[in-house]
Amino acid sequence: MDRKYKDTSSEEEDSLNEDEMAWIPWYCNLKGNEFFATIDEDYINDDFNLTGLSSLVQFYDSALGIILDSDPDDPLSEDQQEALERSADILYGLIHARYILTPKGLAHMHEKFKKAEFGRCPRVFCQNQPVLPVGLADMQGVDTVKVYCPRCNDIFNPKYRRHSHIDGAYFGTTFPHLLLITYPELIPTKPPQQYIPKIYGFKIHKSARERQLQIQQKKNSLSNNNQNNQNNNINNNNNNNNNNNNNNNNNNNNQQNNNNQQNNNTNK
């Protein structure tokens, strides 16, 4: 099996013989795939766990064969190989979304969370709180994976761009919340601190900010009205010019008709 379509992420991987390494651990160790758990082959071999996926993945059987290290029956062209590898990516991601909701999958992700392998919250007052991957939808192709902070209860883009290609459906909308229910000791007990805007040491009153917002909205409204009036004036001027041109054309036509009439009278 050709495995050159992605680079490995560590010197240790470079030292391993890829021909002797199973596809699943090899795939999960690729740079950019650190969020993925290593799915047990027993889980994948159970057809019940894959129900409904065959209609979602092109070349399903061949892609499943790649994941389970089954050699293809016939030699593949480079284009065929790339298409199958892409299908294997998608299939593994869809299986992964189901696996991490199982007790064994949750336990695996629990260990990764404790090691902060998914990153930490970028918010200052969350004090480097580890985050969890989450999808904004359970349907593939809607959005990329985000990270959820259990301290501030907000979501962010992953820190590293190499994770920006991962589909959010490969983790789903349920996973982080199910993990925290399963392992309640992971829920931060300290409430998140909120930033308080101040000017010269004094807290900005909410009404002052609302007043500034109202003023800005009025300015925007006046600006839009002025722009609309200008556009209307331009349109009116254009219409007047068109009317003047039409009148001039009519006058010219009338003059031409008069000239023609005079010529006819002269000829008679």
Swiss-Prot record:
Give the residue ranges for region: Disordered.
222-268
> Per UniProt, what is one Pfam family of this protein?
CK_II_beta
Write out the biased-composition intervals (Low complexity). Answer: 224-268
GO MF annotations, alphabetized: protein kinase regulator activity
What Gene Ontology cellular component terms go with this record? cytoplasm; nucleus; protein kinase CK2 complex
Query: What does the similarity note say?
Result: Belongs to the casein kinase 2 subunit beta family.
> What is the role of the protein in this entry?
Regulatory subunit of casein kinase II/CK2. As part of the kinase complex regulates the basal catalytic activity of the alpha subunit a constitutively active serine/threonine-protein kinase that phosphorylates a large number of substrates containing acidic residues C-terminal to the phosphorylated serine or threonine.
State the oligomer form and interacting partners: Casein kinase II/CK2 is a tetramer composed of two alpha subunit and two beta subunits.
Q: What is this protein called?
A: Casein kinase II subunit beta
Organism of origin? Dictyostelium discoideum (Social amoeba)
Q: Which gene encodes it?
A: csnk2b
